[in-house]
């Protein structure tokens, strides 16, 4: 059984954590994040240590305990160091470019696919085949990267499409053909 919820969270210097009833605000050098804490969880801040406690050992509360602790930890990590996800575009003629606050991708469709930059996210396009999604909110960075990937998911026969940089695509063999 995991005991992640019991581990205290240390708040680094330069990060300000404020708790108003059930609303947690984390302010750091990269920005500010806010989140509402579940009604069953109790968050206490003593000095530069945050602890999360649960009322009892019911299954729901055990699940929420670790989740709440990890969400708070991710908020603190995000305002100190940005989160980033790297996507790679594989395919002949597939490319991405940044135009103002839009990401424009040519993905083999009859039209370019345009995507507005969500609030709190920045796109970097170091070359035509790489997109880097950056932001302080881990959840939003992951969600945005997943939305970009769904525009043209990698296909298993040729490996063409948008994939995460660390993702490995299991390739399939084409059909054998007649003899």
Per-region residue spans from a language model:
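N-terminal intrinsically disordered, cationic/polar leader segments
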Residues: 2-146, 150-179
